[in-house]
Regions:
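The beta1-alpha1 cofactor-binding region of Rossmann-like NAD(H)/NADP(H)-dependent oxidoreductases
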Residues: 37-38, 57-72
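A glycine-rich helix->loop->beta "capping" turn
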Residues: 49-53, 73-86, 92-97
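C-terminal helical subdomain
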Residues: 67, 193, 217-258
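N-terminal Rossmann-fold NAD(P) dinucleotide-binding loop
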Residues: 16-17
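Conserved glycine-rich Rossmann-like NAD(P)H-binding loop of the short-chain dehydrogenase/reductase
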Residues: 26-42
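Catalytic loop of short-chain dehydrogenase/reductase
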Residues: 89, 93-94, 103, 125-189, ...
Length: 268
């Protein structure tokens, strides 16, 4: 990973933080994108303490304005972009819309990675042309198995269900992965998505409504993985020679799996 540049969203906590630290230890320049500046500075210090290189762009990725700005800033500040890891995402128990009138789950989990990838694509394509390859990794989830309600995608007609909104967002991100991998298949750029497993830090959050705020952390004690272990597949997919051959795949524990059939529908 020496001399390579990695961009990771949501890099200050959980899976994103663990992935950033491990890739930095492998020699990559890690460019994180996150909204909490103090946490970002702490992570850069941690990276540098171990001899790595890190820098940050502060942005609220639920904002399309901030996302576009972050993309332009990164594209203008790095010489190459070898790996983009779209990791940032969240579950929003209560309905809300951003200042741009997008439902929060839709904005953060799908629209933002779509837009950030768009703004970084020229730099990624340039890197692939000059150095032979580049990689895009989208953090999806096993929780992508819900049909998309295109008629009420933003929940403007009411009926918000947080779990369904989350499933739909990961459905869209998974489908986007397949579409982009086909589009870029002759470019030297691979595009894959990952179900990282159930990460303890995410499962321990208590912002779910009752009784889920009690059930979810308990479930996490039994099936959740610590972020350091869950980062194994993202790090492997971003850095290994073996993963270089994988493209257009839904991956769990380093193995290609079949996602829900509607996500693979080329005509959808």
């Amino acid at each position: 990973m020496k001399d390579k540049t990695v961009v990771i969203t949501g890099a200050t906590s959980g899976l994103g933080r663990a992935t950033a630290l491990q890739l930095a230890r492998k020699g990559a320049l890690v460019v994180g994108v996150a909204r909490n500046e103090s946490k970002a500075n702490e992570l850069v210090k941690e990276i540098e303490k171990h001899g790595g290189k890190g820098q940050f762009v502060v942005a609220d990725l639920s904002s399309m304005k901030d996302t576009a700005g972050a993309g332009r800033s990164i594209a203008g500040s790095v010489d190459r972009l070898d790996i983009l890891i779209n990791n940032a995402g969240a579950h929003f128990p209560k309905y809300g819309v951003t200042s741009e009138d997008f439902e929060f789950t839709l904005a953060l989990n799908y629209l933002s990675p779509f837009l950030l990838t768009h703004h970084l694509m020229d730099k990624i394509e340039q890197t692939a042309a000059e150095h032979g390859e580049a990689r895009i990794v989208n953090i999806s989830s096993i929780m992508h198995k819900a049909p998309i309600n295109w008629d009420n995608l933003n929940y403007g007609d009411g009926g918000y269900r947080s779990t369904v909104a989350y499933y739909q967002s990961k459905h869209m991100l998974t489908s986007f992965t397949y579409l982009l991998s086909r589009k870029l298949k002759e470019s030297g750029i691979t595009v894959n998505c990952i179900h990282p497993g159930f990460v303890k830090t995410a499962l321990a959050k208590s912002d779910y409504p009752f009784p889920m705020n009690v059930i979810v952390p308990i479930v996490g004690l039994f099936i959740g993985e610590p972020p350091e272990r869950a980062a194994d597949t993202p790090v492997w997919l971003a850095s290994s020679d073996e993963a270089k051959r994988m493209n257009g795949e839904y991956i769990h524990h380093r193995k290609a799996k079949k996602s829900w059939p509607p996500t693979r529908d080329k005509d959808a």
